Amino acid sequence: VSEDDLPSDTNGFKESIVWNKLYTFQKDAALAIISKLEQFNGCILADSVGLGKTFTALAVIKYYENRNLRVLVLCPKKLSDNWITYKANYRNNPLAGDRLRYDVLYHTDLSREQGFSGETDLSKLNWAAYDLVVIDESHNFRNGGDVDDDGKSNRYTKLMNKVIRPGARTRVLMLSATPVNNRFYDLRNQLALAYEGNSSAWKDKLDTNRSVEKIFRSAQKQFNAWSKLAPSQRTTEQLMRMLDFDF
């Protein structure tokens, strides 16, 4: 994706501090992410650890904040300090001049109906009002929706039903160095957050002959066959040859 393809590239985000701290590959990634968020409503940034996923995501956040859209960062509590620092009026914040204003909440907050998360009163929070949700460590949502024996929805289902489906159109940016654990359905479940669990909506956009569900079912079948090959044959190149073009 070139800079010429960036939608509404007149809001000044390329003059931001965070944009000018990015390496070229991060700028390319940010532009591609914005394009995919607008076209498909979701994107997974799956760069390896140490390649600056957070700063790339912050540039994307700056783009949407400059459009006066509301942004939520959902992260594990152990990762919250950095996200909070980058939007705070702190001397040690290298991005203070960008005045980022996104909200930061924890994955576990999805299961809470009251109490405070930082300064946020969860009993009053309008979860459905966010235009962009950035999910750090999105692989924590790889198992999809479920209901436990007590009839309580898990965090994935709460994310879908409290944040993504209701209210404003919600774009979903997922960050993970390991989006797939040991099955392709891990990836499908995360992507389903972008199409609100309605895979037919993506089939038309992707211009494929098969549904997303069938594509992933076939890919998982090929992966299972590949995993049973002799070690000398179990190469990345062989897996790529076995997977369908649609995947």
Each model region followed by its residue ranges:
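A short helix-turn-beta junction within AAA+ P-loop NTPase domains corresponding to the substrate/partner-engaging
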Residues: 187-200
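Conserved pre-motif I regulatory segment
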Residues: 8-44
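P-loop (Walker A) phosphate-binding loop of NTP-binding proteins
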Residues: 48, 76, 178
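Pre-Walker A (Motif I) flank of P-loop NTPase domains
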Residues: 38-45, 69, 170-171
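Accessory nucleic-acid engagement/destabilization modules that flank
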Residues: 1-3
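Conserved helicase ATPase motor motifs in RecA-like P-loop NTPase domains
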Residues: 167-183
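Walker A/P-loop
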Residues: 40-59
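SF2 helicase/translocase NTPase motor core
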Residues: 9-21, 54-58, 65-164, 198-247
